[in-house]
């Protein structure tokens, strides 16, 4: 039997991650120890959970907008109480505005659509095209506009993933989006290329483990795979390499590497194994088609944790469906129309009875899912920390209030310091450190049982409050995981500088214009840094 390393086979799924990443890191660690150098740091990751249609902001935000937030503070919150156990590892980022807000007047962004342009610009910070000239149901680009640049996940992945591999993009509940319907699309490989990602748990598990094909692996085949060590997999390659003339130093390095593989690899996997997969509930029997979001969402999050555990991807984005039937939560209707309070797609009219309570139920469920993800990441040790500690795990929301559709005062909650890059245990108001910033007025959206379009700005957050550009926070995240920039501060492959600029504009009023690209407020938010 050939003992030649098949790169195509090994890199097909978990094999590449399990062998290449952990053992290369171990070799570096061993080499560092023998030479008295610092042990290489654990990988840094960006993990994103994205939800649509905003929230009840005055129930989501705490009263304190700048200062320490304790476990008791979170426990007292209406929506974020499930996050209380992780309070000392949380960073609530306040004062942020996302780019390209929709309105009838087009004063804070383009006029295409409250969802299409927001999703297209959210992680790109680029305008969408075509640029609608009016706000109407029949305007150009209402449902199919595309951003003029690629999204953050791809910008990061090409630098921090091995070989510039694509990010892991998980569409919880199934793949959504097409070139004729881009309302919910957030991941763009390029302006003309939607990145669909993965929408089926079984597909993701198969991609990760390489053990599961159309059907389960037989017990004999599985045990055979488990018995193979790394040396078994690459024995012929190793022998061929040993026959190549090399210096004594290289011979010693090669012998040390082989010894290390024998020491560390009773199997070809370390934490990246079936035991940990099973501990996450990721067995072949459990990961089957079907089920509603109550089971699919935590399963997909567990798969994201397994991917992080295996170092299979250092940029992991996941999203819930743009609009879904919420009956499994005991709520009648779909999430989009519930968010509008009217029971339909219109933004004014008679409020549906108990619509505010229904929104709260959905908001609380999202918080429970994020708490599940954070708890799983925090349960696995990585060096002297946990997976969570070595990551920046961020819950982003498409908008602030779901009927006002405002993008200022954006709800953002980060878990994990990403290797002590970020300050945690705090709410930090990057606008002015004001501890009493408004939490918004979402509970006022149905006064006298009506939603009035003329009052939408008042129901959300006044447009001149919490307006600092999200671009700068993206610079924080990129710098934290090791993305580099060129001399101009924009992220670029092969760069050597800190990232200080991202996107076309950081002024949302410029998005409907044809103004030259300009970043008015470069740099990251230093207040978010641990030191």
Predicted regions and their residues:
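Ligand-binding pockets and gating/stacking loops
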Residues: 1-531
